[in-house]
Amino acid sequence: MARRGAAVAEEPLLPSSGIVGIGPIEGINWRTWLVQVFCFALTTSVLFITLVTASLPQTGYPCFYGSLVDYTQKNHSVVDGVWMRQIAGGVAPTLFLETTSLVAFLYYTTLVLVAISFYLIISAVLVRRYARGKECTAVAGCTRPTTTLIASHVTLVLGTLATWLLQVVILLLSHKQAVLGAAVYVVHFVSLVFFCMSFSGLGTASAQYSSNLRILKTNLPALHKMAGPGRAVMTNLGMGMLGISLPILSLMLGIILANSFHITLWQTVTVAVGVFVALGLMFLIIVELIVSHYVHVLVGPALAVLVASSTLAVATHSYFVHFHAMVSVQAPNLATASKAIVGIMAVISIIMLVVRLVRAIMFHKKRNTEFYGRVKTVSSKARRYANKVRGPRRNPQPLNVAESRGMLLAEDSETDAEEPIYDVVSEEFETEYYDDPQRVPERSHRREYR
C-alpha cells in the first residue's frame, strides 16, 4: 500500500491494491464518462464541419463569417466626432481583426478542440483495455480514478458547452448578426475559461495531482503516458487556444458597446485595447501562479499572447490608416498610445515566456528528473555535432604535432564536461518519487536514457 507523502494532505485519488474488478458505482461512472466523451467528440466534429462549410461560398451561407467589418466603404456617420447621429444616418465600422487573422484563430481553436477529443477517445480505449486486463489487479477499481486523471465530468460538460457556443457564433456571423454573435462569444469565452482551468488542474491540489501521477506511473505506465506527458501537451494547446481568444473577446465587447450606446469612435478603440491588455496580464499571472504548478513546461500561454498582441497591432494599424482623419480630430494621440500599449504587452509576454522556461529548467534540475536529463543529453549531442561540422572549416590547413595534441586535449575535456551528469538519482528524489518503501523498483538506481 502506498504511504502518504509528507506534503500531501489528502488521501490518494488512486486506491491501493485490493479487490479486483469494478463495482456498480464505478460501472455507472464509467458509462457516463464514455457518453460524455462521445458527446464532446460529436460536438467538435460538427463544429469542424460547420467551420469548413461556412468558409466555402458554394455551401449556401449568406455571408462569410470572417468579413465582420468592411473598411473600404465610405463613412457617412461621423459628424463632429459623434456616431449614428440622425443627421448623418449611417454607421461607422468598429475596430476588429482582419479576415485572415479571425479565420486563422477560429480554425486553431477548432483544431485544438478536435485534438482534445482525439486525446479523450484514445484515453478511453486504453482505460477500457487495461480495466479488463491483468494490469487492473494492481489498482482496485482503476476505471474511475483513471478517467478522473484524464478529464472530469464537469470538464467534459464545459468543453461541450464551449464547443457548441462557438458553432453558434460562426452561424450568427455568417448571417451578419454581429451584436448577437458578439454576445454569444462572450458566453463562449467564459465557458472556455472554466473548461481550460478544469482541464489543467482537474479540480485538485497540485501536490495531490503529482502524487496521483506517481501512483499511476507505478501501476499503469501506459495510461500514465496519457495522463502525464499527453495532458501536458494538451494543456499547452488549450492554454494557447485561450490566449488567442483574448483579442477576439475584447473586440467583440467593442462591437456590443458601439451598437448599444452613443459613444465616439476613439472610445471603442480604447475599450478594446484596454480590455485586451487587462485580460492578457491577468491571464499570464494566473498561468504563472496556478497552472504552472501542474504543467511546468508551459510555453503555450505566453506564445499565444505574443501572437495575439502582434495580430491586434496589425489590426489597429490598418484601422488608423483608414480612419486617420476622424481619429486625429477626436483623439490625436490615440494611434501612438494604442500601438505603444500593445507593443508593451508583446514585450511582457516574451519576458513571461523566458521566466517560465527558466523556472521550468530550475525545477527539473533541482529534482534531477528524466526530462532534464534527456534535455541535457540532446543539447550535448547537438553541440558535439555542431563542433564536428564546424571543425574542418575553422582549420582547413594541416596542423603540426603540438597544435594537434592541444586540440585533442581540449576536445576531450569539452566532451567530458558535456556528458550528462544526471544519470544517478539522488536519495531525496528516490524518496519523493517512490512512495512505497517495500516495493522493489524494476530499474536500478541509475537511469537509462533512450
Curated annotation (Swiss-Prot):
Domain of life: Viruses
Segments on the Intravirion side according to the record's topology features: 1-31, 123-153, 200-236, 292-294, 356-450
Transmembrane segment boundaries: 32-52, 102-122, 154-174, 179-199, 237-257, 271-291, 295-315, 335-355
Residues in the Virion surface compartment per record: 53-101, 175-178, 258-270, 316-334
Family affiliation: Belongs to the herpesviridae glycoprotein M family.
Assembly description: Interacts (via N-terminus) with gN (via N-terminus). The gM-gN heterodimer forms the gCII complex.
Species of provenance: Equine herpesvirus 1 (strain Ab4p) (EHV-1)
Protein name per the record: Envelope glycoprotein M
GO cellular component, one term: host cell Golgi apparatus
Keywords noted in UniProt: Disulfide bond, Glycoprotein, Host endosome, Host Golgi apparatus, Host membrane, Host nucleus, Membrane, Transmembrane, Transmembrane helix, Viral envelope protein, Virion
Membrane topology listed for this record: Multi-pass membrane protein
